[in-house]
């Protein structure tokens, strides 16, 4: 670890699962404490906002899309390496060797950052349905009927389900909260 890179690159840290937020906060505090802000950029726990329907009410929550990992933008040198490794609950860097971690590619970093941006603009639904999937209607006039998903509209949180009524397939529009997956 004798090379000094002058450009900040993105590295992935493995943290104890469930402690990603605490690791990110502690790392930011260590960076300030050791006055190394010029050698570090962002410290991120990649999360996305998801919307779920609970008892007919829409509720937003955050979900980590890389559980157990923290992204760090930094210049890699002996001091920054030791600072990161000294943070409690950090198991190490992902990629490269223990002494010389490898950064993720700029393309990978851009993909993750774009996903973070999209999530903040438009929350995803926790329930994900696919056309052709079998569901059971749980509420409304078609309760206890089984059907096949034909269309999914995540913007409105609605599905078009083909329900068999008296032997005929009938398309029915339902909200995500009115159905559950059968398998």
From Swiss-Prot:
This is Transcription termination/antitermination protein NusG. The keyword Membrane does not apply. The lineage of its organism: Bacteria, Pseudomonadati, Pseudomonadota, Gammaproteobacteria, Pasteurellales. Participates in transcription elongation, termination and antitermination. The keyword Manganese does not apply. Gene3D superfamilies: 2.30.30.30, NusG, N-terminal domain. GO terms for biological process: DNA-templated transcription termination; regulation of DNA-templated transcription elongation; transcription antitermination; transcription elongation-coupled chromatin remodeling. GO terms for cellular component: cytosol. The gene is nusG. Belongs to the NusG family. Residues 131-161 form the KOW domain.
């Amino acid at each position: 670890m004798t090379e000094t890179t002058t450009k900040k690159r993105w590295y992935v840290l493995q943290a104890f699962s469930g402690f990603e937020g605490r690791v990110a906060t502690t790392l930011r505090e260590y960076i300030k404490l050791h006055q190394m802000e010029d050698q570090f950029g962002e410290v991120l726990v990649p999360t996305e906002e998801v919307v779920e329907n609970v008892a007919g009410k829409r509720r937003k929550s955050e979900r980590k899309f890389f559980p157990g990992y923290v992204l760090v933008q930094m210049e890699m040198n002996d001091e920054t390496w030791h600072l990161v490794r000294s943070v409690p609950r950090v198991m190490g860097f992902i990629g490269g060797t223990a002494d010389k971690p490898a950064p993720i590619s700029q393309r990978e970093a851009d993909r993750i950052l774009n996903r973070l941006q999209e999530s903040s603009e438009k929350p995803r639904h926790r329930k994900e349905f696919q056309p052709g999937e079998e569901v059971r209607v749980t509420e409304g006039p078609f309760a206890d009927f089984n059907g096949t998903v034909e269309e999914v509209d995540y913007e409105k949180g609605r599905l078009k389900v083909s329900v068999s009524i008296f032997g005929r397939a009938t398309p029915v529009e339902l909200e995500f909260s009115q159905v559950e997956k059968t398998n």
